[in-house]
Swiss-Prot record:
It comes from Neurospora crassa (strain ATCC 24698 / 74-OR23-1A / CBS 708.71 / DSM 1257 / FGSC 987). The gene is ard-1. Gene3D superfamilies: Medium-chain alcohol dehydrogenases, catalytic domain (3.90.180.10), NAD(P)-binding Rossmann-like Domain (3.40.50.720). This is L-arabinitol 4-dehydrogenase. Pathway: Carbohydrate degradation; L-arabinose degradation via L-arabinitol; D-xylulose 5-phosphate from L-arabinose (fungal route): step 2/5. The keyword Amino-acid biosynthesis does not apply. SUPFAM superfamilies: GroES-like, NAD(P)-binding Rossmann-fold domains. Optimum pH is 9.5. Active from pH 8 to pH 10.5. Binds 2 Zn(2+) ions per subunit. Zn(2+) 1 binds at residues 53, 78-79, 163. Catalyzes the NAD-dependent oxidation of L-arabinitol to L-xylulose in the fungal L-arabinose catabolic pathway. L-arabinose catabolism is important for using plant material as a carbon source. Not active on D-arabinitol, D-sorbitol and D-mannitol. Pfam families: ADH_N, ADH_zinc_N. It catalyses: L-arabinitol + NAD(+) = L-xylulose + NADH + H(+).
Length: 363
């Protein structure tokens, strides 16, 4: 099906030399207008809002995350929402004009993780923005309709925030946070802050959030007055844990949701949780770290990890639509697509105080 697109498709690229630039991107305007490249089951989305993730900055600045390496010109971005402007005739569930959030992964539907409902472990997944799969920081993208979730009248800004919300939801679900659980959140970056809001919505109490940045802790208190903030000091993991427990009023947390991936933070969380407690690592860290093994052993601490998310988007949409999780204040900076380079400079500079930077192409 053809579309009425009128602007050249542009995208935000990086490369192994750590350059960052805006250039024409695929699919071309002519292709979008004629619907030539739409495959069976696909729709064309005019991307309206895309959040900059820490991984986007990392791919730009460092060229890799673990084994995922930028080896050629590469389009960034995977936190997006937009408007459907064309649909393949085979698509019946979505129509032109629908507002959608894009789940940025395409799975094989044939491997063991896919067939058992844990498709985030798909052995042949194409995860958008993870090299070599191009990302969503483009004006137009073609994407399978099944991974385009209708958001109704939700703002595109909130629609783009559903991706990091899905990360937090996956963590809370697997960590098993229960009503009344004392919960520690390590890290007050975007994922930590959203995890905090989700833990509050799940009935966790008391809540303590840690960070090295007083500005981010202040922001956490503003959006969640119930939370107790704890500034991380240069102490041993054991001493840090004692200070954290003091912030809980002497209660040892049942669950620590670790959102930094930093070795010292993970170690402090292991020292802090109660006997039989759980440390659930949402953050991404180094290939190898040291942990206080015997502390975890003699206290029967469960240590779990997370890789992306699965089956979270419908739940995330319901949470936002019904006001249980308010993401609006997390977007602190907005830039038009044409000023994407300024957006990345803002997102990568701690001095700006940015929480979530979004690149928008609103028409």
């Amino acid at each position: 099906m053809a579309s009425s697109a009128s602007k050249t498709n542009i995208g935000v690229f990086t490369n192994p030399q750590h350059d960052l630039w805006i250039s024409e991107a695929s699919p071309s305007l002519e292709s979008v207008q004629k619907g030539e490249e739409l495959k069976e089951g696909e729709v064309t989305v005019a991307v309206r809002s895309t959040g900059i993730c820490g991984s986007d900055v990392h791919f730009w600045k460092h060229g890799c995350i673990g084994p995922m390496i930028v080896e050629c010109d590469h389009v960034l971005g995977h936190e997006s929402a937009g408007e459907v402007i064309a649909v393949h005739p085979s698509v019946k569930s979505i129509k032109v004009g629908d507002r959608v959030a894009i789940e940025p992964q395409v799975i094989c539907n044939a491997c063991e993780p896919c067939l058992t409902g844990r498709y985030n472990g798909c052995e042949r997944v194409d995860f958008l923005s993870t090299p070599p799969v191009p990302g969503l920081l483009r004006r137009y993208v073609n994407h399978p309709a099944v991974w385009c979730h209708k958001i109704g009248n939700m703002s595109y800004e909130n629609g783009a925030m559903l991706e990091p919300l899905s990360v937090a939801l996956a963590g809370l679900q697997r960590a098993g946070v229960r009503l009344g659980d004392p919960v520690l959140i390590c890290g007050a970056g975007p994922i930590g802050l959203i995890t905090m809001l989700c833990a509050k919505a799940a009935g966790a109490c008391p809540l303590v959030i840690t960070d090295i940045d007083e500005g981010r802790l202040k922001f956490a208190k503003e959006i969640c007055p119930e939370v107790v903030t704890h500034k991380v000091e240069r102490l041993s993991a054991e001493e840090s844990a004692k200070k954290i427990v003091e912030s809980f009023g002497g209660i040892e947390p049942a669950v620590a949701l670790e959102c930094t991936g930093v070795e010292s933070s993970i170690a402090a969380a292991i020292w802090a949780v109660k006997f039989g407690g759980k440390v659930f690592v949402i953050g991404v860290g180094k290939n190898e770290i040291q942990i206080p093994f015997m502390r975890a052993s003699v206290r029967e601490v469960d240590l779990q990890f997370q890789y992306r998310y699965c089956n979270t988007w419908p739940r995330a949409i319901r949470l936002v639509e019904n006001g249980l999780v308010d993401l609006t204040r997390l977007v602190t900076h907005r830039f038009p697509l044409e000023d994407a380079l300024k957006a990345f400079e803002t997102a990568s500079d701690p001095k700006t105080g940015a929480i979530k930077v979004q690149i928008q192409s609103l028409e």
